[in-house]
């Protein structure tokens, strides 16, 4: 089987047990508010209040974007010490996105209603590295997992992507590296592990984590699952045991399916947009009705309860995934009763249709 329970070791944080289901925070698609500072107008995201609440409690991991840090979107105006580093201290690992998600104007039209979004100009590789230098230079550095600057690199040869990422990661040796592979053919939009050579896989051994965005694995669910399986098998054959990170792959149904074929790290803002109820993601607005909060609850109260319950659901799902591996994929009773049979049937199909799961090619 391709699924496993691994451990990654961070230079500052030590050993971290996987899988990790990483709550992400981003200004994209959420409302920007304004405040005045020294006669200038400052934009900050309403998500900062979620981040403040999240940071008040210990957590295994969190993700923020260098784009938002650079523009001060997570600087809360009411706080005497508003810098977001304050909110991140309680997380054992802090994943830093290079800003690729925020630099793309598209918002998933199939998702819940989001605010109109236009990326700000003036953020690129140099600004990203400036954020890294500032965070790495703190008297007490954060336990960072950093990505390569992947925006605009689609179509670059894989060896070029690898060389550029190595140069960046070498300058920040106290950070764990998370190399995001982008489609490497001139017109390619999808990652195709089946086209990677043994040398390509071997060249990835210098990184700590290998990342792919969910969207660049394909539009169809089963195609994405097959590509993750091929990537995991290729890495294993190349003697690379580091985890696969599915960027944007945080979902109560999709995350287990990706985990079953070897991915171990998943992030996303879905936990801020949806409500996780009975093992599935539902419209957040109706959460008060189907939960114990009640139909008379205000939108603010409903949102607060949904966020807190979502974090509990992610923690429970993490434990379930670990138990599933412990039982060698033969039991599904650790998952929510509403979805366990569906996951069982899906995995049986995957085993019969994806040779890599049982060691084939």
Feature roles, as predicted:
Residues 1-56, 236-244, 252-361:
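Alpha/beta catalytic cores of nucleotide-metabolism and tRNA/nucleoside-modifying enzymes
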Residues 1-176, 351, 355-361:
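Non-catalytic, usually N-terminal nucleic-acid engagement modules in DNA/RNA processing proteins
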Residues 62, 146, 209-210, 266:
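Hydrophobic residues within beta-strands of alpha/beta enzymes
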Residues 65, 149, 213-215, 269:
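Conserved residues at the C-terminal ends of beta-strands
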Residues 124, 157-161, 220-227, 303-306:
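Residue-level preference for long, well-ordered alpha-helices that form the structural scaffold
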Residues 140-143, 207, 263:
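A structural motif
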Residues 176-245, 251-256, 261, 271-292:
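Glycine/Thr-rich beta-alpha phosphate-binding loop at enzyme active sites
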């Amino acid at each position: 089987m391709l699924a496993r329970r691994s451990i990654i070791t961070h230079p500052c944080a030590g050993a971290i047990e996987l899988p990790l289901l990483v709550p992400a925070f981003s200004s994209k698609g959420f409302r920007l508010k304004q405040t005045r500072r020294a006669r200038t107008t400052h934009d900050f995201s309403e998500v900062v209040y979620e981040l403040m609440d999240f940071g008040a409690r210990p957590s295994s991991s969190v993700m923020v974007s260098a784009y938002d840090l650079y523009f001060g979107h997570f600087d809360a105006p009411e706080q005497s010490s508003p810098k977001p580093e304050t909110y991140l201290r309680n997380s054992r690992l802090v994943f830093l996105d290079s800003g690729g998600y925020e630099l793309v104007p598209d918002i998933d039209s199939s998702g819940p209603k989001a605010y109109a979004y236009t990326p700000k100009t003036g953020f690129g590789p140099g600004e990203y590295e400036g954020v890294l230098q500032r965070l790495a230079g703190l008297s007490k550095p954060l336990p960072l997992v950093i990505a390569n600057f992947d925006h605009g690199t689609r179509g670059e040869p894989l060896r070029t992507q690898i060389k550029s990422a190595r140069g960046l990661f070498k300058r920040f040796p106290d950070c764990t590296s998370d190399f995001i592979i982008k489609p490497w053919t001139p017109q390619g939009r999808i990652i195709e592990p089946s086209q990677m050579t043994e040398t390509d896989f071997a060249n990835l051994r210098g990184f700590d984590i290998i990342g792919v965005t969910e969207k660049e694995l394909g539009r169809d669910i089963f195609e994405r699952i097959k590509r993750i399986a091929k990537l995991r098998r290729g890495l294993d054959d190349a003697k690379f045991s580091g985890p696969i990170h599915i960027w944007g792959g945080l979902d109560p149904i999709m995350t287990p399916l990706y985990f079953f074929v070897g991915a171990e790290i998943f992030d996303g803002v879905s936990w801020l947009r949806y409500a996780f109820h009975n093992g599935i993601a539902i419209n957040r607005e109706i959460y008060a009705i189907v939960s114990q909060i009640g139909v008379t609850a205000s939108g603010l109260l409903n949102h607060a309860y949904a966020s807190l319950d979502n974090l509990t659901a992610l923690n429970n799902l993490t434990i379930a995934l670990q138990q599933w591996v412990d039982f060698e994929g033969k039991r599904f009773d650790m998952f929510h009763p509403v979805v366990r049979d569906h996951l069982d049937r899906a995995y049986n199909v995957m085993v019969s249709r994806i040779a890599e799961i049982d060691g084939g090619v």
